[in-house]
A protein has these predicted regions:
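Glycine-/charge-enriched secondary-structure boundary and capping motifs
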Residues: 2-16, 123-141, 154-163, 223-232, ...
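N-terminal amphipathic/basic leader segments beginning at the initiator methionine
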Residues: 2-39
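Residue-level signature of catalytic and energy-coupling elements of molecular machines
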Residues: 20, 70, 187, 259, ...
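Glycine-rich phosphate/pyrophosphate-binding loop regions near the starts of catalytic domains
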Residues: 30-196
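Short secondary-structure boundary/capping elements
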Residues: 48, 88-95, 236-239, 284, ...
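Short, acidic (Asp/Glu-rich) active-site segment that either coordinates a divalent metal cofactor
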Residues: 175-225, 229
Length: 367
């Protein structure tokens, strides 16, 4: 039988888990159209449209302000189940700072919003530890935030410990050095930087597959994991700020910077203008991904839509600079690989040759 398109399969699985995709729903489109009405001209107008990892605001000076917001999603549920909250703050910083650097901006501050079921001292203190560690890794400050106690809205696996954690990060970038992907050309090289694991995406599917379908236990190891399942799932999202900023400061010809989150390598198309991407080599994904795939009966196509599959960030650069990009990432303590190259393609397709998958319009289809 022919395999279902991974986009359709992914949507079905998320609906089964209680999450419906919104990016093509009329309400989402209407919201975006309304927010565009706030865009003006002159000082303070956005330099990019919706859909990039971060937007950039012209404030009337040569330096512009990059801004992005994101949260940890249902990774918070795993933290609640384990009563372990000291790493989700790192995830919150990572999800925001990694987006801000995608436009070539250097992040310098983030504010947080913590919505809680109850203002538990231990919960808040442990979240704070993670935020501080994340700020250290990203070289930013956290000058403020908000705590909202809303038990009527926030519920949890452990009564009294429900929370949601969101951040908004800002950075600065010279308008002449803005990185948007518009300078990519055929022959440019795609360098992938290793992820630390599942990062902060796909947790609804992971919990459904691992805990509800396969009945695995968070406090036990499984498969080829070198730690308990819970510790693996809570590994903090890797922060790529220092190595990316070094590449920019040293003047490497960086054509595009891509945070690999939900939608996987399809995120490359977010920064493309008439460029397609051919992945000729892929690293072996960490064991957590095969564990999810086997437990949930998930296709390769769906896995590469939902998860980073071992590559948390991509740098598109000229062929002559690819070795230096790899070396800088490795000097920062991270693995990095040449994954593929760019081609001229008005459809902005992403081909994963080792998996015989073609990506376009939010899906990977086998060929």
């Amino acid at each position: 039988m022919a395999e279902k398109s991974s986009a359709a399969a992914s949507a079905e699985r998320y609906r089964e888990a209680g999450v419906a995709p919104v990016n093509e729903q009329p309400g989402f489109i209407s919201l975006i159209d309304q927010l565009r009405q706030t865009f003006g001209s002159g000082a303070r107008h956005p330099l990019l449209d919706f859909g990039h990892f971060a937007n950039v605001l012209d404030i009337g000076y040569q330096e512009a302000i990059a801004i992005s917001t994101d949260g940890v999603g249902t990774k918070a549920i795993v933290a609640q189940m384990l009563d372990k909250y000291d790493t989700v703050g790192i995830d919150c910083v990572a999800m925001n700072a990694n987006d801000v650097i995608c436009v070539g901006a250097e992040p310098f501050a983030m504010v947080d919003y913590i919505a809680v079921e109850a203002a538990d001292d231990h919960l808040l203190s442990e979240i704070g530890k993670g935020l501080v560690e994340g700020a250290r890794r990203a070289n930013i400050v956290i000058p403020g935030g908000e705590i909202s106690q809303i038990p009527q809205i926030i519920r949890s696996e452990r009564k009294g410990f429900g929370f949601d954690l969101v951040g908004t990060c800002i950075g600065t970038v010279d308008k002449d050095r803005l990185i948007t992907g518009d300078k990519m050309e055929a022959g440019d090289v795609i360098v992938g930087l290793a992820s630390s694991g599942i990062h902060s995406n796909g947790f609804t599917l992971a919990r459904t597959a691992l805990l509800e379908t396969a009945h695995l236990r968070l406090n036990e190891s499984a498969g080829e994991l070198d730690c308990t399942l819970g510790d693996e799932l809570l590994k903090p999202t890797r922060i790529y700020v220092r190595e990316i900023m070094q590449m920019i400061r040293e003047g490497l010809p960086i054509k595009a910077l891509v945070h690999i989150t939900s939608d996987g390598f399809l995120n490359l198309a977010r920064v493309s203008q008439g460029i397609g991407f051919v992945m000729e080599w892929l690293p072996e994904p960490p064991p957590i991904f095969s564990l999810i795939q086997e437990a949930g009966g998930v296709s390769d196509g769906e896995m590469f839509v939902v998860y980073n599959m071992g590559v948390g960030f991509c740098v598109v650069t000229s062929p002559e600079a690819a070795d230096r990009v790899q070396a800088m990432a490795q000097n920062a303590g991270n693995q990095a690989w040449r994954l593929g190259h760019c081609i001229e393609d008005a459809d902005k397709k992403v081909e994963l040759k080792p998996k015989r998958l073609m990506g376009q319009d939010g899906r990977f289809t086998p060929y």
